[in-house]
A protein has these predicted regions:
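Active-site metal-binding loops of divalent metal-dependent hydrolases
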Residues: 9, 186
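Short N-terminal binding/cap micro-motifs at the start of the first secondary-structure element
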Residues: 12-17
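Internal catalytic-core helix/loop-beta-alpha segment
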Residues: 113-167
Length: 230
């Protein structure tokens, strides 16, 4: 399976739409996406994500599943250093890195900062739960920190086959894997990646950056039994 996560183009947050530059980004993005063999599209219900997706969907004559759980985080927390209310990923490095819970992919929501607003944990868990439900419709069942592919013919490939290993090359997928494209937001994309890669949310959100109209591609590694890991 291939998962492609697209952040909305440059936003006009006041109108919940796109700036003039954002519309140009969305058009250029559509030229790239329209060349893909996409199984299904998903999109946040917020205007800036829907507007970004609209160019691609029109060009491909497709529709997207609008999913409320893909809406951006609306909850905020009080930054203990600045005293300001901020998104639950805008922290001072020397502050959040001093809390061991921030390095736990499950317990980070119990950290002193994040637990100050229980909605942060609830939103994160909602995204993770709904992501797993969507993957399950394609046969990918969460099993602790990996996925198991329902009905998949088991095979065991120790290393990536080289071109001079034809008998092993034949065992690789033939390219007909499902391809899912999701139009969403920074916090949502960070949450999905945190869950799939088993990386603490705050750590990932500070270590990686997903600019407007960015494209993040995950491909499931499926070479050992019925196991899959993104």
């Amino acid at each position: 399976m291939r998962l492609i996560l697209i952040r909305h183009a440059e936003p006009d947050y006041v109108r919940d739409s796109l700036t003039e530059k954002g519309w140009r980004e969305a058009e250029l993005l559509s030229e790239r996406v329209s060349g893909w063999d996409v199984t299904e599209f998903f999109c946040s219900p917020l205007g800036r994500a829907k507007d970004t997706a609209s160019k691609t969907l029109k060009k491909m004559n497709r529709t997207a599943v609008t999913a409320d759980w893909l809406s951006e985080f609306s909850c905020q927390v009080k930054n203990p250093v600045t005293g300001q209310m901020t998104s639950p990923w805008e922290y001072i490095p020397s502050d959040w890195t001093s809390d061991p819970l921030m390095y736990d992919s499950e317990a980070w929501t119990n950290s002193e900062i994040c637990s100050s607003n229980p909605e942060v944990g609830r939103k994160y868990r909602l995204i993770c739960r709904e992501m797993d439900r969507m993957l399950e419709t394609y046969g990918y069942i969460r099993d602790k920190n990996i996925y198991r592919v329902r009905g998949k013919k088991e095979q065991y490939i120790i290393h990536t086959p080289a071109p001079d290993e034809p008998e092993k090359m034949e065992m690789l997928p033939e390219g007909n894997e499902p391809c899912i494209v999701i139009f969403a937001h920074f916090g949502v994309i960070s949450s999905i990646l945190s869950h799939l890669l088993n990386i603490p949310f705050v750590l990932l959100a500070h270590a990686a950056f997903f600019p407007a109209s960015s494209v993040t591609v995950l491909s499931a590694e499926e070479r050992w039994g019925n196991e899959a890991y993104f």
